[in-house]
Amino acid sequence: MTDPLMRYFEQELTFVRRALGQFGQQHPEHAERLNIHQGQIEDPSLARLLDGVALLNATIEKQLSEQLPEVVEGLLNVIYPSYTQTIPSVAYIHLSPQGDSPESTIIPKGSHFTSDAKGRMCQFTTVDTLETAPFRLVDTTASSAPFKFNRPAGTEQSTAVIQLSLSTGDPSIRFSQLNHQDLDLFVQGFENNADSIIELLLGQTKAISISDISCEKHIVLLADKLKSRISDLKFLFLPQKGNQFSGFQLISEFFFFKEKRQFFRLKDFGQAAKKIDSSEIKINLFMNAIPAEFMRLFDNHVFKLDVIPAVNLFEQTGEPTSYDQRCLTIPVNADAHSDSDIEIVEVKSVFEITPQGEKPLTPLFRDSYQSDPTTDYWQSARNLSGQFRLAISLKPTHELEFSKLYGTNLLCTNGKQSCGIDGEMECSENIDVLGTFTAIYPPTAPIEREQNLNLHWQFVGLLNGNFSSLLHAENPTEKFKQMLLLCSREQVAAEEVQTIHHVSVKSQVSAIRIMGKNVFSPGSEIELTLDTQNGFLAFSDVLNRFFQQFCSFDRYIQLSVKIYGRDGIAKRYPKIHGSQLAM
């Protein structure tokens, strides 16, 4: 008997003897007939029988313990597919246009870019559509009041302004002729540190205007037209999973991709710019205040146009693999070359290769009433070493022997190799773009999949991570922290979670305006207290959107944020009703 099995055997034997003692106390007459006295067995045959029962139970217990991580990981792959996957590298690609007059070009979401990394070709896929700007950002300045121009109405209380000068590069091309809708900005910040300017834009913007170059004519926009895309559900870096809670992915990407908070969008920019009949305009961001030490730091590198994130994910057809009656599972290989650096992230589909062509198989957990009843099924599993294997469930057949050939469509990554790309990035799509693409920063390092042996407890935590459990928790603050930490990984420093000092949830009925009508609705008002001296607005924006994902159709959610040690509410978000989210 092996040492691990002996340990399980001793545990089961102790349990059996304890059960015998309880049996003797509850049923003394029957225990006496079996020669059981004070938990001791005098009949050697009965003793050997119970030893055999303990050994059988120990064997089963050992097998269950060894298979539990694989079973839990299989369940996670169905409910939270991205939880156990490798987080790929991300490159932030910037277009440097050629010529004096840039042209507008649309680079669709899912476009592929390639770059060389020490002789290996790495492939990246864009996560959003990029409409390149038909103008340049020629200057960025900041100044404090009194201003050298006439300020528009509604900005009287502002004490500082950030001005972005844009030019089409050709006097004959005017902004009134362009059809550029929203303006996407990437905040590179001061010396590649963007946290302070992000907090400034989110917390101090009073009003926005689009003006001519001399600031004589202003088209005023509301301050909330400038939004960070950190909580934009249409701006997700990782592939969306239909059966996965969207709030989990939102929080995860906040922790995994720090640069995501640097993307901003100015809504309705195009409509305002059309009213300026000039080839040069200014975007004026009127601020409540700007620290004096920031004034001289503003230059043409603080903001950038035409930046798009791209993840090191790409689809590839796997190597064909034969399957016969001697196999329980078959391996999945992305590339037959032994020196290949391609890593498999997900098996997307499986098909049988026949003389008549490819015959698709149905994923085991995606079967439905519309599925073909004659089709075969497949399910992929990954062991603790990261090797994917494929299990095939064939329809009933009378054949004792068979041989089939299967192919796979895979989602792959280049792993750590992608961090070494250097130089220009080339667009693989059939798109004519006048300019060069380069990565602003070196691509981020991939985050390896979880290797925690206590994964089953994390799985239980994910299943229990909902608004109801938070509402009825004895300590909602610690419960909320645990929920957020489940969205991160051990390798990632989620410092923002530790700033949460207190969370309280209050249920009440309140007036809310929906579709132009005032109604009374039940809802939940959440008060969050953060203990921080640093920026918090990007984090609170994400938490506000996170809580909204729990909002039912007939209730509302409102988040208020306080800073520990300060009086009053630092940020109160408007009430949002579940019916509004469903529109």
Regions found by a protein language model. Name each.
Residues 1, 55-64, 74, 78-83, ...:
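Short linear motifs embedded in intrinsically disordered, proline/glycine-rich low-complexity segments
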Residues 1-28, 34, 222-274, 282, ...:
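Mixed-charge (acidic/basic) macromolecular-recognition segments
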Residues 1-214:
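Extended assembly-interface regions of large multimeric machines
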Residues 45-53, 75, 201, 306-308, ...:
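Short, Φ-rich (hydrophobic/aromatic) sequence segments
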Residues 57-61, 81-82, 144-179, 298-303, ...:
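Extracellular ectodomain segments of secreted/surface proteins
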Residues 107-109, 122-128, 217-225, 420-425:
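Short amphipathic beta-strand/extended segments with alternating polar/hydrophobic composition
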Residues 171-368, 372:
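Short, low-complexity Pro/Thr/Gly
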Residues 354-583:
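C-terminal domain/tail detector
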